[in-house]
Amino acid sequence: MASTLDLDKGCTVEELLRGCIEAFDDSGKVRDPQLVRMFLMMHPWYIPSSQLASKLLHFYQQSRKDNSNSLQVKTCHLVRYWVSAFPAEFDLNPELAEQIKELKALLDQEGNRRHSSLIDIESVPTYKWKRQVTQRNPVEQKKRKMSLLFDHLEPMELAEHLTYLEYRSFCKILFQDYHSFVTHGCTVDNPVLERFISLFNSVSQWVQLMILSKPTATQRALVITHFVHVAEKLLQLQNFNTLMAVVGGLSHSSISRLKETHSHVSPDTIKLWEGLTELVTATGNYSNYRRRLAACVGFRFPILGVHLKDLVALQLALPDWLDPGRTRLNGAKMRQLFSILEELAMVTSLRPPVQANPDLLSLLTVSLDQYQTEDELYQLSLQREPRSKSSPTSPTSCTPPPRPPVLEEWTSVAKPKLDQALVAEHIEKMVESVFRNFDVDGDGHISQEEFQIIRGNFPYLSAFGDLDQNQDGCISREEMISYFLRSSSVLGGRMGFVHNLQESNSLRPVACRHCKALILGIYKQGLKCRACGVNCHKQCKDRLSVECRRRAQSVSLEGSAPSPSPTHTHHRAFSFSLPRPGRRSSRPPEIREEEVQTVEDGVFDIHL
């Protein structure tokens, strides 16, 4: 039966199920494993798993009436294959697991021990960790002591730990998450996929933040060089997803406009940067990336955004069913969907060739939560290098890779709300790591000198006095934990940027930064931050997501007044751009900073 199925012409679910049963022989050997795996993986696209289990039970009962012992045993072999190949589906779906238990109980009641022994539902391990947005898995401690300072980390060390973080997050994504995203076109009620996209965007933003935290062009150029080599190591690890995140951060408008900084980057680094950028550019539907991925052997981490885009394109181009009655499924579409999802599923079957340091993982996790808005990053970029019509005198003729074509926006989601208890536990472990590695004299406190070292990893950490609550000249574990709990994005702040709100009067209507509605009246109906000037309703105070930034003027060399950043009119939390491919000898086009970008270039776009 399996050999007679013509998927291109379409078939019913029953025909496909019968074909999968017939794909087994009486001993359990599969003659067409690809068909069986494809149907068992893809069936939730068309019918619920509980309905498939009911159909299997019906097939078994019908074969018993027909005295077809061969069909009975083949049905049991298919159930066994289903449980062993997709165990998470049974652990996370109690209704489905109960149906299989009922089938096994029926076999036992009939005294058919041989068939019953083929179905083992009790030994399915737990997969509840896959549904937890925040989860610390045990990791192996490296033998040698590793520095937690960003400036001291080797590119391979940083690449390995970024790979581990993203791989751990990726392993929690299930088929149902992909199906939900493609069906809804967004990540509504999809916290696991939201979290992965959030982590991807955090890496890109962290790259920008680390570059912009340096006060001089030479220092910023060194950080750029460091991240280019991190991207090179990510390619060696065949981690294309994080590679794209790092390259996206390096190519973002807040970084690409830093002409003086780029003039200090060496020609060899620029050449390497261009090559890495060309690898992940969207040109030719990511043809360079696809060729490189196809040639990979062993562990590989594909760019999730590219493959999600492929899934969405298929969903829009081809129908799931070939008839109005929804009885004949589109086998050609199912085969194409399966090829994409199987590539993604293969990632979890191969562990990355890295060993992770728990202290560094904790530090990186918290560092990546230092969220900034588009406006804030661009304003900081303007402070580092104010606008100027004339180009700086360059020690070299090197230029950064040119800006890219606009990439389509295709996802916009809210940052998942993490479990507060889990975040508190994670912060405590991170603080313990900080004290273990930065408390040089071992007195159980962080001095001002030690605090300055820590700020290398947290560029926009609040002042020493803000953490030193009792003003005794040093920071205790409890004070640091208290600070991070207050400023954690989960608890309302943003890593030290908590608003100093007070009641305010306004003679004219002003807009609430949270709900965008006007604050009307001259009485104290609103709140205003004394530091950054943000306004909000009293009832919006606890939901205000924008971080506090002290107001700073950005004045061009010509003395013109500051102007809004290019992203001001398009409120999006993060999207990144990729440089446009071109000849290396050509100069990049001038970026007109005064123009407003109506759509920021990006693959992932997520409101954090």
UniProtKB/Swiss-Prot annotation:
Gene Ontology CC annotation, any one: synapse
UniProt entry keywords in alphabetical sequence: Calcium, Cell membrane, Cell projection, Cytoplasm, Guanine-nucleotide releasing factor, Membrane, Metal-binding, Phosphoprotein, Repeat, Synapse, Synaptosome, Zinc, Zinc-finger
Location within or outside the cell: Cytoplasm, Cytosol; Cell membrane; Synapse, Synaptosome; Cell projection, Ruffle membrane
Tissue specificity field: Expressed in striatal neurons (at protein level). Expressed in the hematopoietic system. Detected in olfactory structures and deep cortical layers of brain.
Pfam family membership, one: RasGEF_N
Residue ranges annotated for the EF-hand domain, each copy included: 426-461, 463-490
Signal peptide location: none
Location of the region described as Disordered in the Swiss-Prot/TrEMBL record: 382-405, 555-596
GO biological process terms, semicolon-separated: cellular response to calcium ion; Ras protein signal transduction
Record-annotated Ras-GEF domain positions: 154-387
Binding site for Ca(2+) 2: 468, 470, 472, 474, 479
Gene Ontology terms, MF aspect: calcium ion binding; guanyl-nucleotide exchange factor activity; zinc ion binding
Quaternary structure and partners: Forms a signaling complex with RAP1 and BRAF. Interacts with F-actin. Interacts with RAP1.
Entry remark concerning the domains of this protein: The N-terminal Ras-GEF domain mediates association with F-actin.
PANTHER family reported in the protein's UniProt record: GUANINE NUCLEOTIDE EXCHANGE FACTOR, RAS GUANYL-RELEASING PROTEIN 2
UniProt similarity note: Belongs to the RASGRP family.
Function field: Functions as a calcium- and DAG-regulated nucleotide exchange factor specifically activating Rap through the exchange of bound GDP for GTP. May also activate other GTPases such as RRAS, RRAS2, NRAS, KRAS but not HRAS. Functions in aggregation of platelets and adhesion of T-lymphocytes and neutrophils probably through inside-out integrin activation. May function in the muscarinic acetylcholine receptor M1/CHRM1 signaling pathway.
Name the UniProt record assigns to this protein: RAS guanyl-releasing protein 2
Species of origin: Rattus norvegicus
Upper lineage: Eukaryota, Metazoa, Chordata, Craniata, Vertebrata
